[in-house]
Amino acid sequence: MIKYIGVFAFLVGGFCHDFETVISNQDPIVDGMRLVEGDMLFDDGPLFTERNAVKYDQQLWPNGEIVYEISPGLRQYEQIIREAMRTYEDNTCIKFRRRTNEADYVNIHVGDRCYSRVGKSFRGGPQPLSLGRGCTDFGTILHELGHSVGFDHEHSRADRDEFLIIHKENIKNGSEHNFDKLWENNTRTIGPFDYDSIMLYGAYAFSKDTRKFKTMEPVEPGLPMKSVIQKGKLSYYDIVKVNKLYKCPPVNPYPGGIRPYVNV
């Protein structure tokens, strides 16, 4: 049975800004890795463009087990972080285990923005997942954990132009690269395009004016494009894709065949 925790139950401590309005619009180097599309870290160099789901099995967590450590600065948010982890655990074969002395782990800490390494680092050792101001709602934590599991943004898929209209004229200056598409021959694309995915930003992401100008909208008119914080849950196909990537046993997260709209 799929288990969801609604986003609004976890808007605590004043960190309730939509992270799509606070993520970086540049590609700096953070901990020796390149920050791409605002919140994803990749090992700097030619491999950092090879994205969607991670391409190489070495970037998957062995046996689907992700070792983590939560910094003391996030103690008041530990419950919501664990609830987000349990959402993956309850619906996929991914497991999160608190670190004892393991060398390879996700270091969940308070940074100056929201970001995560995508998949397991080739280099090994600790890899950052930052939950700064505006990053501690349930949907955003699910999103950043999705990067740690191994997924890129849905709006960067090589086939995204079949499903999304990108309004380049509405993108704020310096943020255009956040809408670059993946290279089709350098990515592992899994499943159909999913408008409900927690890995898809909302219609106003990186907008010059988030009250007026959409930067993305569905090709099919009338379909909603909620922000990550508004979604606040994994979609059916988020779950299917994780299970496929990690070769999990079959799972039916929607008993009775109830599924959200997905453009196949």
UniProtKB/Swiss-Prot annotation:
Keyword Protease annotated: yes
Tissue: Expressed by the venom gland.
Residues spanning the signal sequence: 1-16
Documented activity regulation: Inhibited by 1,10-phenanthroline.
Main location: secreted
Subunit structure: Monomer.
Annotated CDD domains: ZnMc_astacin_like
Pfam families hit by this protein: Astacin
UniProt-annotated catalytic positions: E144
Positions annotated as glycosylated: N173, N185
Co-factor binding comment: Binds 1 zinc ion per subunit.
Residue ranges constituting the Peptidase M12A domain according to the UniProt record: 52-249
GO cellular component: extracellular region
Propeptide feature ranges: 17-51
Disulfide bond entries: C93-C248, C114-C135
Listed GO biological process terms: proteolysis
Protein name listed in UniProt: Astacin-like metalloprotease toxin 1
Functional summary from the UniProt entry: Zinc metalloprotease. Provoques deadhesion of endothelial cells from cell cultures, and also degradation of fibronectin, fibrinogen and gelatin in vitro. Its role in the venom is not fully understood but it might act as a spreading factor that facilitates diffusion of other venom toxins. Alternatively, it might be involved in the proteolytic processing of other venom toxins or it might play a role in extra-oral digestion of prey.
Annotated GO MF terms: metalloendopeptidase activity; toxin activity; zinc ion binding
